Design a protein with these regions (language model features):
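Short beta-strand segments
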Residues: 54-56, 118, 141, 176-178
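Short, flexible micro-motifs
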Residues: 59-61, 81-82, 158, 181
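Glycine-rich phosphate/pyrophosphate-binding loops
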Residues: 90-91, 169-187
């Protein structure tokens, strides 16, 4: 989804949560200043014409992995990377706003996993801490107006951003595992994010 299509949804999200567009733009500028190389061509190559599996970090992920097509291009939403690692799987890309980042992310990135790092108004300290430590491929994203080398393919939370990115970059099919949009054991903010994940994924034809 290009930004002109995404922008109306973004403003709805800002209003729903009371988030600051100015803070998002500040974070995007910070991330732009920390990007040393844009790995978007590599990410686009992974997606184009491929079968992509996006793994969310819901508790159901471990059960869902019994159906994982290991020949697919595997994307992890943030801490889902830890679950995949326990099963000996290194994802092709991790989509993260860094709130679930650990040193495992550094090791995966060094081994070739693309870190798709997202900037928003609440994660400036995490951007400053983690970005200089990544030695492998990185793609930078924002939920607001894109900048040179800071992209916006649509989507809001880590999981749905991964789906939107795969779709925009030409994946042939996208399978979703580890998404539980009806999880009752979440706080109100997370519940709102699940509401928006369902609403946004429906734009791409996913009934979750």
């Amino acid at each position: 989804m290009n930004y002109s299509q995404w922008e109306p949804h973004y403003h709805e999200i800002l209003d729903y949560f009371g988030f600051s567009q100015e803070a998002d733009e500040t974070a995007a500028r910070l991330l732009a200043s920390l990007v040393t190389h844009d790995a978007l061509p590599a990410l686009a190559t992974l997606c184009a014409g491929s079968t992509v599996t996006v793994c969310g970090n819901a508790p159901c992920l471990e059960d869902d992995l019994t159906t994982l097509d290991t020949a697919s291009v595997i994307f992890a939403a943030d801490a889902a990377a830890d679950v995949l690692s326990r099963y000996g799987i290194r994802p092709a890309a991790v989509f993260t706003d860094l709130d679930g980042a650990t040193d495992l992310f550094l090791a995966m990135n060094e081994a070739g996993t693309i870190m798709v790092v997202h900037a928003h108004g609440d994660n400036l300290p995490l951007l400053r801490y983690w970005m200089p430590r990544f030695t492998g491929p990185v793609v930078a994203t924002t939920q607001g107006t894109p900048l040179p080398h800071v992209h916006n393919f649509g989507g809001f939370s880590d999981g749905d951003r991964a789906v939107f990115t795969a779709d925009e970059l030409g994946a042939r099919t996208i399978t979703i595992l580890g998404f539980d949009l009806d999880d009752p054991d979440v706080d109100p903010v997370k519940r709102g994010k699940l509401f928006w994940a369902r609403k946004l994924l429906a734009l791409l034809g996913y009934a979750c």
